[in-house]
Regions:
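Alpha-helical subdomain
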Residues: 1-39, 43-226
Length: 226
């Protein structure tokens, strides 16, 4: 991963640990629903299968990605939890309300939305529509967790940021980078959309929380693009 950009491995460790903790706690609290937006090859429904209990889990992604994921799971003889529902979806084109309703999603239930590694590949309109769906179609107290890419002016001096962005634009030409957000504007961005900011886990916070060793030193520098 570090050939992609320095600190990428450390970033994925920290981001995964952060979201793992949120999902695990939600399951322990028996949250009614968890929705993974752009789930890709996420394995949390498998890794935390013993904690799922009454929770319904929806994984949204493109049909080809989900088909490939299910093939890989079958080849590895990994059982899919009964509570997990694969929902073929294109966040840039399909109506989330209709798509999720057809899959059994209930808008009157407390829900955790996990939107990991996705926003920067979506056009701003799709980001707006997804946040609007969450605001209008989830019970009070529902939570959405998402990461975002910082703006180009902010990248100067950020560890590995410019190299990572350049690499992503070069290697993944079929997935252009379309959405970014200034770090100091996150609270205002959400407030304008009537969403309360509960925690802003910046790179500095993630680094301190998950990469600090017992002697107080850091396990390594971390990519500071997201």
């Amino acid at each position: 991963l570090d050939t992609f950009s320095p600190g990428t491995y450390e970033y994925f460790i920290a981001r995964t640990a952060y979201l793992d903790a949120i999902v695990e706690q939600a399951l322990r609290d028996h949250i009614p629903q968890i929705v993974f937006l752009g789930a890709g090859y996420d394995t949390r429904a498998l890794r935390f299968a013993d904690l799922i209990g009454p929770t319904r889990i929806f994984e949204l992604d493109s049909e080809p990605t989900q088909a490939h994921k299910r093939t890989l799971l079958a080849q590895a003889d990994v059982s899919i939890p009964v509570a997990l529902r694969f929902v073929p979806t294109d966040l840039t084109q399909q109506d989330l309300k209709e798509t999720l309703a057809q899959a059994g999603y209930a808008s009157d239930l407390h829900t955790l939305f996990v939107w990991e590694g996705v926003t920067y590949y979506l056009p701003p309109r799709a980001v707006e529509e997804t946040l609007a769906f969450v605001r209008e179609n989830a019970a009070a107290g529902s939570v959405i967790c998402f990461d975002y890419m910082i703006t180009i002016p902010e990248m100067a001096g950020r560890y590995g940021a410019q190299q990572a962005r350049d690499t992503m634009r070069t290697l993944y030409t079929d997935e252009p980078l379309l959405f970014d957000l200034a770090e100091d504007q996150v609270a205002a961005f959400l407030a304008e959309r009537e969403i309360d900011l509960l925690e802003h886990a910046t790179a500095d916070k993630l680094r301190e929380r998950y990469l600090t060793l017992r002697d107080g030193s850091l396990a390594g520098p971390m990519l500071d693009l997201f």
